[in-house]
């Protein structure tokens, strides 16, 4: 089994989350943010609103594994979901909370990702780290520089990033002009 999700699978999960359950906005936002920002589960559950600048469209990502913190751009779909989520839970300092307004646990995130994958009709049970890997593989497939991907994902060691570029389907296409 592959260790990442394809973009179409992630899109299916976001759409499935948006259509199901009373936490549809929260769950869709979780899937999208983990994918678009390569967030680890611990980074996601610790995410606070003070790290999110909805006006300027930026997210301050604090990496947990001694990586490099970074400021990531937030784009249209993420901004819309985050604004809607903030209206739903206006009093919490945490972005992703339970009904009791406590931060979600890593176990809850695993359950949300698994449930959303099932709702999306995936033939396997996805886990949260597959969304992080999906981010890396997607960025590599778009031809982004390995060092830039390393910084974006907060990898200290570039060897952790090289795995994504090694499988990029178009990595040799522009080596020769003729």
Residue ranges and their predicted role:
Residues 1-178:
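Conserved catalytic core of the tyrosine transesterase superfamily
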């Amino acid at each position: 089994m592959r260790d990442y999700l394809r973009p179409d699978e992630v899109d299916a999960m976001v759409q499935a989350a948006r259509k199901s359950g009373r936490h549809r906005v929260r769950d869709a936002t979780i899937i999208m943010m983990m994918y678009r920002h390569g967030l680890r589960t611990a980074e996601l559950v610790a995410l606070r609103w003070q790290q999110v600048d909805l006006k300027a469209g930026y997210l301050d990502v604090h990496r947990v594994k001694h990586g490099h913190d970074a400021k990531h751009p937030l784009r249209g779909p993420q901004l819309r979901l985050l604004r809607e989520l903030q209206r739903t839970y206006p009093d919490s300092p945490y972005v992703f909370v339970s009904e009791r307004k406590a931060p979600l646990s890593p176990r809850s995130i695993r359950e949300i990702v698994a449930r959303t994958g099932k709702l999306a009709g995936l033939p396997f049970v996805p886990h949260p780290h597959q969304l992080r890997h999906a981010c890396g593989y997607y960025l590599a497939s778009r031809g982004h520089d390995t060092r830039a991907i390393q910084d974006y994902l907060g990898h200290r060691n570039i060897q952790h990033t090289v795995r994504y570029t090694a499988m990029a389907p178009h990595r040799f296409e522009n080596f020769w002009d003729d």
